[in-house]
Swiss-Prot record:
Probable transcriptional activator. Binds to the consensus sequence 5'-AGGCCY-3'. InterPro entries: Transcrp_activ_Zfx/Zfy-dom (IPR006794), Zinc_finger/UBP_domain (IPR050688), Znf_C2H2_sf (IPR036236), Znf_C2H2_type (IPR013087). The binding of ZFY to DNA is mediated by the interaction of the GGCC core base pairs with zinc fingers 12 and 13. The lineage of its organism: Eukaryota, Metazoa, Chordata, Craniata, Vertebrata. Keywords: Activator, DNA-binding, Metal-binding, Nucleus, Repeat, Transcription, Transcription regulation, Zinc, Zinc-finger. This is Zinc finger Y-chromosomal protein 2. Residues 373-382 have a biased composition (Basic residues). It is found in: Nucleus. GO terms for biological process: dosage compensation by inactivation of X chromosome; meiotic recombination checkpoint signaling; regulation of DNA-templated transcription; spermatid development; spermatogenesis. A motif (Nuclear localization signal) lies at residues 372-382.
Amino acid sequence: MDEDEIELTPEEEKSLFDGIGADAVHMDSDQISVEVQETVFLSNSDVTVHNFVPDDPDSVIIQDVIENVLIEDVHCSHILEETDISDNVIIPEQVLDLDTAEEVSLAQFLIPDILTSSITSTSLTMPEHVLMSEAIHVSNVGHFEQVIHDSLVEREIITDPLTADISDILVADWASEAVLDSSGMPLEQQDDARINCEDYLMMSLDEPSKTDHEGSSEVTMNAESETDSSKLDEASPEVIKVCILKADSEVDDVGETIQAVESETDNGNEAEVTDQRTSIHVPRVNIYMLASDSQKEEEDTKVIVGDEDAGGTAADTPEHEQQMDVSEIKAAFLPIAWTAAYDNNSDEIEVQNATASAMLHHDESGGLDRVPKQKSKKKKRPESKQYQSAIFVAPDGQTLRVYPCMFCGKKFKTKRFLKRHIKNHPEYLANKKYHCTECDYSTNKKISLHNHMESHKLTIKTEKTTECDDCRKNLSHAGTMHTEKGVNKTCKCKFCDYETAEQTLLNHHLLVVHRKKFPHICGECGKGFRHPSALKKHIRVHTGEKPYECQYCEYKSADSSNLKTHIKSKHSKEIPLKCGICLLTFSDTKEAQQHAVLHQESRTHQCSHCNHKSSNSSDLKRHIISVHTKAYPHKCDMCSKGFHRPSELKKHVATHKSKKMHQCRHCDFKSPDPFLLSHHILSAHTKNVPFKCKRCKKEFQQQCELQTHMKTHSSRKVYQCEYCEYSTKDASGFKRHVISIHTKDYPHRCDFCKKGFRRPSEKNQHIMRHHKEVGLA
């Protein structure tokens, strides 16, 4: 049997538990487990109580003074009225003290703490159960330890300082360690998971239990924890140590403001609560609370330090910069038992209790407040790179956040400026993951290194060239050398003055410059055509299709015109007869004559001016107008083109409406085709151009045109370089030109080769490329 366990005889059990009631006690063979809460007795008389026994044992109330803990309510046989209340009252859930000198001693029963109180009868709400007794004696009471099984509570505990709901009974025997519920049934038979729960709260006191009485003005109570922290469950992953305060001196009125500061004693186990008028000596009580999840230790627990005056500063400070000193314990964080003992206003008690509970609240450890943590539905974003920051507080209270550089200590207002600064540090460049094997290039991205290596491959290809002996041109292949040594053919654009020596460059020029006039592009070679029929003929070159065959030989062609040319050149002697209407050829004269009769029979409309016949009147009319009429009475107003009939003029005018007309600046010529306009200017106005603009090199036929053009330049501001003929309209470009070309002052010098640079970033890049090994050494 442990030294903390005692064995009671049947007579002692009967005398001990008769006052509690048979229904509240469950006897298990020879042992019984009882959890005895701290009981505080108040008396306003000067009567000394020794070995007191209650006159009415059925009305005994065992009350706990520790906040947020379930208490034991022993059902009484009857309830007393408020009129029966005498001077001796037991106040539940409050820490009270003697207003006058009291000597309290219990035989074999140790009272851990007795605190002072200034609660008056006017501001006190009386509980439901009140004990009236002139002399209370308790004898033959064994030594018990207070054990708080917080893990057995499956719901959130809500405690009112003055009106607590006394409904549940949790009784435990230190000897048997069996837990009973309100009905007397052991809880371990109900649910093994509840007993094996890791979350519990264990309180340990500092010094051996003793009661000191030093006159009528002070009552000091010191106790020792007989439960060592080493007795905790070995499987517990984490133990959180929480410090609370206890008072051991008598103060009738502490005041409205209580400040707790660290005592300057050598032992370091006591804190001192000071006020302008009083001083209270407060020993510490250590409470160990088990945290069920050790993986939660990486998460930060928000701690708010300070009272109402410091609230603004704590709110302005970021969470990761708020620190808490154990020595700075404010009055707002006093336990509710203390606040109840020194304050008459219960509303202020609740406010201070809420603040105090926030210190003991730990979501991850599963402590007293069992509020289920809601799972966030938001997806976790990838953590960005964190940068250290510092806050400067001005004398007027304003704060300024800056971001210092980890290499040189230079401070910046924003993260963007800090990032740009760090990228130019040699230390940062040396820590890059990927380095080029050909040069000093380094990067943290693999794709960037891949793109950089591709540039090296292109450089290697361009270096493998052959120089032509005639024109000193670098050629990549030997075959190109033979082609280049051939005839220097010049390819000219038929729409403008562009000239090139390669056909591919000319095709590229046509696609880029004259693409609008060539909407039909070949998918194989990129050549453009104006009409889809021309593209269709061109595609046959790539496919090899030759639909046109010669009837005299095996010749095939992709174009009908090529076939006709072939027949005329190769088979002219074999075709003596040819129809003049349908261009059919015949080898026999009779066949040709029979074919001509067919044309004569079909044409019944004879022309009056010639022997022409038509199959219908419309064809005959068209023949007369086009052949025998030289006048064009219907002319276009835009281009002065003439037509024989008004219908033809109407169709022609529609083409002008759908197209934009381009006016020649030298004459009245207009054309919907810009290429025709360019051809007109080159042919009609480029022979003699006496007037030329000195700024834009534009040419004019007349001097008035040049003067009008010069006005457009005068309205724009031109920046002329004083060292050279460079001029520009861009101010930033002009400044960049002067600095880069005409400025010899290079403020940023290399420490190794004394080479100058205009910007620090250029100097750092130079060091990493040419002095990397020296810089790292």
